[in-house]
Amino acid sequence: MDQLPAAELTNFISPSGPESRPVFHSICGIHDTANVQQKQTLDQNKVISAPLDYLLSFPGKDIRGQLISSFNEWLQIPEEKLSLIKRVVELLHTASLLIDDIQDSSQLRRGLPVAHNIFGVAQTINSANYAYFKAQSELHKIGDPRAVEIFTEELLRLHKGQGMDLYWRDSLTCPTEEEYLEMVSNKTGGLFRLAIKLMQLCSASEKDCVPLVEYLGIIFQIRDDYQNLQSEKYIENKGFGEDLTEGKFSFPIIHSIRSNSDSFQLINILKQKSEDTTVKLYAIKLLESTGSFEFCRQRIAQLTTQARSLLMEMGDPSQTAGIQGILAFLELK
């Protein structure tokens, strides 16, 4: 299914209607309350959703939407609930990007200025937080209280993972590979699991797709870390070597530091959070010297092979074309 239009998600998060304020209108000499209320509602909705609308107006790869459609080849949930889950996940993902860009001091998102540099930090945070709670309230339409339990569990895990990622960056603490992958499972895997668990809740199938989704989340993040420092397309969308400027301990950086006992140079480059291209190019040479990019490629290939084996164990290959396509996309060519 294609990316949901921004207008549809905007309508999705809009409040149901304004509260009547007859006393206020009387004091102000306003008599046509219907028109005033309509204008007020439109203005409020526009203000609240503006940062979200901005980011939704130039959509990304929609890997989560594709993942939901692919797993529905197995789970076969009703179209109405499938659309609801897609909208909720897209809304949560967009809100999380707004917050991430603030926490990471990013300048670009999908090749354009980040939302908080246009609407301000405070308004962007409020818009993202509103979207989180609106998405939660919409889950009641599924008609099963476990939907909100799943939402709460995965949003807690997502923020736990984000908290560790920020802690390592801000305290200049290099995690182990195991610690990093646990963080990725919590953070990146959160919305992947949320989508699939909600789908399983709405499905007559007893198939458990969560273990496979765990693989996809980890592969996705390692690939993203690799692309951040190697992909020309990524440079267009996010800027050159953004993880180095952010001071982030990404997968290749962790490998380089832990495979080289004399790693003071790379750690100090992270500490500087430099925007200097020459410094970042030097850091990339350090990563190349420790074979860290090759290690990423090997790890992705290994995890992809394991994911495909699990996929074959789970059922009819004729129902796995969509998931196979996602795995092919995630592979580094």
Swiss-Prot record:
* Class in the EC hierarchy, top level: transferase
Residue positions binding isopentenyl diphosphate = K61, R64, H93, R110
Identify the stretch annotated as signal peptide in this record: none
Inactivation phenotype? Strongly decreases the production of 15-deoxyoxalicine B.
Q: Name the EC number(s).
A: 2.5.1.-, 2.5.1.1, 2.5.1.29, 2.5.1.10
GO MF, one term, reads: prenyltransferase activity
Residue positions binding Mg(2+) 3: D224
Pfam families per the UniProt record, alphabetical = polyprenyl_synt (PF00348)
Q: Which UniProt keywords apply?
A: Magnesium, Metal-binding, Transferase
Cofactor dependency: Mg(2+)
Q: Give me the residues that bind dimethylallyl diphosphate, please.
A: R109, K187, T188, Q221, N228, K238, K248
Extract the Gene3D superfamilies matched here. Farnesyl Diphosphate Synthase
Entries under InterPro entries matching the protein: Isoprenoid_synthase_dom_sf (IPR008949), Polyprenyl_synt (IPR000092), Polyprenyl_synt_CS (IPR033749)
List the catalysed reactions. Answer: isopentenyl diphosphate + dimethylallyl diphosphate = (2E)-geranyl diphosphate + diphosphate; isopentenyl diphosphate + (2E)-geranyl diphosphate = (2E,6E)-farnesyl diphosphate + diphosphate; isopentenyl diphosphate + (2E,6E)-farnesyl diphosphate = (2E,6E,10E)-geranylgeranyl diphosphate + diphosphate
Q: What is the free-text note on the cofactor? A: Binds 3 Mg(2+) ions per subunit.
Pathway noted in the entry: Secondary metabolite biosynthesis; terpenoid biosynthesis
- Describe its function: Geranylgeranyl pyrophosphate synthase; part of the gene cluster that mediates the biosynthesis of 15-deoxyoxalicine B. The first step of the pathway is the synthesis of nicotinyl-CoA from nicotinic acid by the nicotinic acid-CoA ligase olcI. Nicotinyl-CoA is then a substrate of polyketide synthase olcA to produce 4-hydroxy-6-(3-pyridinyl)-2H-pyran-2-one (HPPO) which is further prenylated by the polyprenyl transferase olcH to yield geranylgeranyl-HPPO. Geranylgeranyl pyrophosphate is provided by the cluster-specific geranylgeranyl pyrophosphate synthase olcC.
Miscellaneous note, as given in the UniProt record, is: The 15-deoxyoxalicine B cluster is a rare cluster that contains its own geranylgeranyl pyrophosphate synthase (olcC), in contrast to other related clusters which rely on a FPP/GGPP synthase localized outside of the cluster.
Q: Which PANTHER family match?
A: GERANYLGERANYL PYROPHOSPHATE SYNTHASE, PYROPHOSPHATE SYNTHETASE ATMG, PUTATIVE (AFU_ORTHOLOGUE AFUA_8G02400)-RELATED
Q: What is this protein called?
A: Geranylgeranyl pyrophosphate synthase olcC
Which species does the entry assign this protein to? Penicillium canescens
Per the record, the gene is: olcC
